[in-house]
């Protein structure tokens, strides 16, 4: 396991490693040789056998949210929607050394994303489902996430940039409240984009990152793909057209598109701002994004992060 380093909220590699060893020991798994995949608000480890992914929260305060994610994953398995699966036979989530821990089946050996048509098909299948009341999913509201992002702007952010983003957030919150959505309200993934749909070992597309499931206007699940094509140039015209064709609705033709796109790119920028003090590359990308938002500049210069 790696040593050194600190994630968000002061979560260290050492603390995560101790929790990993204890949690694996509790359930009879071997933590030796585990690879740290990511350290942020969560630590994510791939066990050496290549079949299990372990997620560890920075503290147990997120236990309720983690328990909801576990419930979502179990329900998706029951309705046979292709998604990340929990390791069977283990009571989850587990609280170990003050951290909430979950164990997931590894989707693949080598990172391979699925296609936009496959993402559209999965979203269409998901959006047709009626959510069970037992999941107690929250109603989606962008305001708390935006406000948390603003509060998380650190020492690496100039005061004038923070003030500009705060003013923009105020305006977008009001505009969001006036939107007239046209798609049915219901279950959403919450962070639907090409980075959250992987191809598994059997060659099938599966949804991952189930933390943001909520009840909301379905337009929110379509906005990132449109934004990545329209403003960032991360998808081609043909790729986006295939997404629209498979889902059956083009959110870019809806009058509220610009407001949702502005909100999503603001959230993406605030997330980077929270990393700016500790990560020079994040600070550089954050500054680039703020300047382009302020001036109406070309978002094609934005880099995935």
Summary of predicted features, one role per range:
Residues 218-251, 263-280:
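Active-site activation/catalytic loop segments of kinase-like enzymes and analogous catalytic loops
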Residues 3-8, 152-156, 160, 238, ...:
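ATP/Mg2+ or Mg2+-diphosphate-binding catalytic cores
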Residues 13, 17, 53-97, 110-128:
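A conserved alpha-helical element in kinase catalytic cores
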Residues 110-163, 183-185, 215:
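A cross-family kinase active-site recognition segment
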Residues 41-48, 53-54, 86, 174-222:
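Active-site acidic catalytic loop and adjacent metal/ATP-binding pocket
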Residues 58-59, 97-113, 128, 146-156, ...:
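A glycine-centered beta->alpha junction motif in the catalytic cores
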Residues 26-48:
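ATP-binding glycine-rich phosphate-binding loop
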Residues 1-31:
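Juxta-kinase regulatory segment immediately upstream of eukaryotic protein kinase catalytic domains
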């Amino acid at each position: 396991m790696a040593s050194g380093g600190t994630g968000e909220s002061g979560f260290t590699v050492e603390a995560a490693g101790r929790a990993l060893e204890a949690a694996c020991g509790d359930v009879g798994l071997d933590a030796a040789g585990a690879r740290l995949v990511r350290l942020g608000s969560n630590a994510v480890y791939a066990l050496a056998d290549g079949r299990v992914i372990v997620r560890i929260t920075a503290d147990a305060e997120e236990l309720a949210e983690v328990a909801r994610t576990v419930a979502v994953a179990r329900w998706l398995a029951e309705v046979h929607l292709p998604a990340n699966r929990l390791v069977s036979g283990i009571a989850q989530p587990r609280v170990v050394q003050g951290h909430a821990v979950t164990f997931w089946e590894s989707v693949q050996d080598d990172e391979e994303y699925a296609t936009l048509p496959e993402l559209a098909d999965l979203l269409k299948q998901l959006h047709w489902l009626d959510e069970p009341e037992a999941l107690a999913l929250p109603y989606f509201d962008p305001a708390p996430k935006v406000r948390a992002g603003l509060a998380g702007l650190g020492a690496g952010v100039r005061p004038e940039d923070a003030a500009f983003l705060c003013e923009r957030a105020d305006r977008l919150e009001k505009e969001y409240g006036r939107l007239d959505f046209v798609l049915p309200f219901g279950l959403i993934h919450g962070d639907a984009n090409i980075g959250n749909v992987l191809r598994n070992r059997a060659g099938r597309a599966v949804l991952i990152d189930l933390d943001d499931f909520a009840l909301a206007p379905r337009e929110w699940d379509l906005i990132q793909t449109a934004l990545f094509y329209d403003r960032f140039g991360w998808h081609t015209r043909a790729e986006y057209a295939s997404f629209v064709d498979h889902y059956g609705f083009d959110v870019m033709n809806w009058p509220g598109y610009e407001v949702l796109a502005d909100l999503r790119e603001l959230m993406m920028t605030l997330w980077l701002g929270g990393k700016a003090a500790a990560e020079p590359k994040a600070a550089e990308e954050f500054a680039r994004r703020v300047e382009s938002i302020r001036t109406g500049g070309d978002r094609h210069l934005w880099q995935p992060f």
